[in-house]
Regions:
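N-terminal secretory/membrane-targeting segments
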Residues: 1-115, 135-155, 187-193, 197, ...
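Solvent-exposed soluble domains appended to multi-pass membrane proteins
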Residues: 100-112, 119-122, 127-339
Length: 339
């Protein structure tokens, strides 16, 4: 990474300059200064790490709070949460008893092992009409709702709301819950190491080539390092996607559309070797907040109806985005049903 090289070069130059500064004569250590300073540091450490001060002040470790609280405070908070305590009652024996209590039945595939496995985590996609009192002018998900043949579908509850997409990724790819982690922490930034058991590792053991793709900047949530630690063979981000089409803005302010995203998934599939097993994990970006953005390249085709009609323009934009996602997914399913 060129930025890392430049940063390292600047740091190295700074250290060289420091080494060339005139040296002052060393003086004897003044214990009168060291003792109170050490006591102050020890008291701060005890207060910060040994009490509930951080929680009481509602300071959470994340990339966003670094901008608000500064590097030193946020680093200290992350340091406090680097060690995660075991949940109460967590023992191998208890886990074994639970596995016996809830035995699983592995699925049997009539046609053997699938050649291609494609997983799509669609940003913020939800069916708002399941909520009481919410009606839309038309079905925003006609294709998804029409799927019955060769389909298993239902509703999923996420562990996050209004942000922290990376936690949903972490739970899916590792099978670990974030329920027992300190509030506000993001595993992608703090708790991922090379060699951790993941779905990616299982797929590679079965002979799959594993690809992660996300049509947004690679700087989000430490994804390049995480995907590498998870064992993905290849990773693709916004700049790697060809013929990008944006919604609600341009390349600077908008998001890559689901249709454009899926066309790139099709390209990745078509470029693989015949018979090669492919596991493709994709996180979309089209429906990311906020929902008061310009309607560039987005038609207003679905909106709130009933008692709420005309009251929430943000929901109208969200409904129209979901409608476009549904059409893009129909394109993807139609393509793979014919190959």
């Amino acid at each position: 990474d060129s930025k890392q090289v430049i940063t390292f070069a600047i740091l190295l130059a700074f250290l060289v300059l420091v080494s060339l500064l005139p040296k002052e004569e060393k003086h004897a250590i003044s214990w009168k200064r060291i003792v109170p300073i050490s006591a102050l540091c020890a008291g701060y450490a005890a207060l910060f790490f040994g009490t509930g001060l951080v929680e009481a002040l509602e300071i959470a470790p994340s990339m966003w709070t670094t901008r608000e609280n500064g590097l030193v405070l946020n680093f200290s908070v992350c340091l406090k949460y680097m060690r995660v305590e075991k949940p109460e009652g967590y023992t191998p024996e208890h886990l074994a008893s639970l596995s016996r209590e809830y035995p699983g039945e592995g699925a049997v595939l009539e046609d053997g092992q699938p050649v291609n496995v494609i997983v799509i985590m669609n940003e913020s996609l939800a069916d708002l009409t399941v909520l009481p009192g919410v009606e839309s002018s038309r079905d925003a998900m006609p294709f998804l709702h029409s799927l019955t043949e060769n389909t298993v579908k239902g509703y999923a509850y996420t562990s996050v709301f209004g942000g922290t997409t990376a936690n949903s990724e972490y739970e899916f790819l590792t099978g670990n819950t974030t329920a027992f982690l300190p509030a506000g922490t993001v595993p992608y930034q703090m708790y991922v190491s090379a060699g951790d058991p993941t779905l990616v590792g299982q797929m590679k053991a079965l002979g799959y080539r594993c690809i992660a793709s996300h049509p947004y900047r690679s700087s989000g949530w430490n994804r390049p390092a995480v995907y590498s630690n998870f064992g993905f063979d290849e990773t693709y981000f916004e700049r790697d996607f060809q013929n990008r089409v944006y919604m609600r803005g341009d390349a600077r302010s908008g998001y890559v559309s689901d249709q454009s995203n899926y066309e790139n998934l099709v390209r990745m599939y078509e470029e693989k070797s015949p018979g090669e097993r492919l596991f493709l994990f994709n996180v979309t970006m089209q429906n990311h907040s906020a929902y008061n953005m310009p309607w560039d390249n987005l038609d207003r085709e679905v909106w709130l109806a009933g008692a709420l009609e005309g009251r929430f323009q943000t929901v109208d934009q969200y409904f129209s985005l979901v409608y476009q996602s549904d059409k893009a997914f129909e394109y993807l399913v139609t393509y793979f049903s014919q190959v």
